């Protein structure tokens, strides 16, 4: 699984340079002159000025009338405000799942809650030689039938869990029957919390040949997603899968959590103390 895919078109040099200047201005408290930016970037002063004037015209930088330096404007915050948790998770998880695939061989998915189901945001199914599905991104995984769904229910806040179960229980059909059996469901969720992972062994009607284990992804003491490992049920039991692969899943989950936390701190820092003058 590669971090950077080959593209059909050449890199737009002007865009690359403009982004480089934005990054430099963010690191230089109090702004920077054309000369300093030219020195740091290695670009000609005329090129730097032209790029800055373009960014100024678009509203991302402004020129200080007092010392002729350039500084970021508040508009740059808009570049990250539309980036939701699931997008951070997907971006951070992709390279980590690639490394995980080489270790566990079986495919893994990162999913997040979408109303009444878990939605796959990132996956290694298309890269795993043991995968039985190639197109998984965007697929909805039922909460009561999959390891990821049960993991979410097990580790989410109690009030959230109660509301989700009530919603599922109100729906007709066998897919939601478990929500109408509170003692049975709570035993399943309690076991997941005790063992640190959720499980599914041939429990999903649409995928009767598969089994899976999943661990929660947390940020600021809340569940933001789940990381699962999917395999052919005939290959091993849940206990064997956990013994063999749970440590790797937990390690990668922690790495994803640390990445999300770092991004959250970075975004918060930019919002509260970004070098906007």
Swiss-Prot record:
UniProt superkingdom: Bacteria
Keywords carried by this UniProt record: Activator, Aromatic hydrocarbons catabolism, DNA-binding, Transcription, Transcription regulation
InterPro entries reported for this sequence: GAF-like_dom_sf, HTH_MetabolicPath_Reg, Tscrpt_reg_IclR_C, Tscrpt_reg_IclR_N, WH-like_DNA-bd_sf, WH_DNA-bd_sf
BP terms from Gene Ontology: catabolic process; negative regulation of DNA-templated transcription
SUPFAM superfamilies tied to this protein: GAF domain-like, Winged helix' DNA-binding domain
Residues covered by the HTH iclR-type domain: 12-74
DNA-binding interval(s): 34-53
MF annotations from Gene Ontology: DNA binding; DNA-binding transcription factor activity
PROSITE patterns, per the entry: HTH_ICLR, ICLR_ED
A Pfam family hit: IclR_C
PANTHER family: DNA-BINDING TRANSCRIPTIONAL ACTIVATOR MHPR, HELIX-TURN-HELIX TRANSCRIPTIONAL REGULATOR, ICLR FAMILY
Biological role stated in the UniProt entry: Activator of the mhpABCDFE operon coding for components of the 3-hydroxyphenylpropionate degradation pathway.
Protein name: DNA-binding transcriptional activator MhpR
Organism: Escherichia coli (strain K12)
Protein encoded by which gene: mhpR
């Amino acid at each position: 699984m590669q971090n950077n895919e080959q593209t059909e078109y050449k890199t737009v040099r002007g865009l690359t340079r403009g982004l480089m200047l934005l990054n430099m201005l963010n690191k230089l408290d109090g702004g920077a002159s054309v000369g300093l930016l030219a020195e740091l970037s290695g670009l000609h002063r005329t090129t730097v000025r032209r790029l800055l004037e373009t960014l100024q015209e678009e509203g991302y930088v402004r020129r200080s009338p007092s010392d002729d330096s350039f500084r970021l404007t508040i508009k740059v915050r808009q570049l990250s405000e539309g980036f939701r948790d699931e997008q951070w998770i997907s971006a951070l998880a992709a390279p980590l799942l690639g490394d995980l695939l080489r270790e566990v061989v079986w495919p893994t998915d990162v999913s997040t809650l979408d109303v009444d189901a878990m939605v796959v945001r990132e996956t290694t199914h298309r890269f795993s030689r043991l995968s039985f599905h190639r197109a998984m991104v965007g697929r909805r995984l039922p909460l009561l039938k999959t390891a990821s769904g049960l993991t979410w229910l097990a580790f989410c806040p109690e009030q959230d869990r109660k509301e989700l179960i009530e919603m599922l229980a109100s729906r007709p059909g066998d897919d939601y029957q478990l929500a109408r059996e509170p003692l049975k469901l709570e035993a399943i969720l309690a076991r997941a919390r005790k063992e640190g992972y959720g499980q599914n062994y041939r429990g999903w009607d649409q995928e009767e040949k598969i089994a899976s284990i999943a661990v929660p992804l947390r940020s600021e003491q809340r569940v933001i997603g789940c990381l699962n490992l999917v395999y052919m049920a005939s290959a091993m039991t849940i206990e064997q899968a956990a013994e063999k692969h749970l440590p790797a899943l937990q390690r990668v989950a922690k790495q994803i959590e640390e990445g999300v936390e770092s991004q959250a701190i970075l975004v918060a820092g930019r919002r509260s103390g970004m070098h906007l003058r």
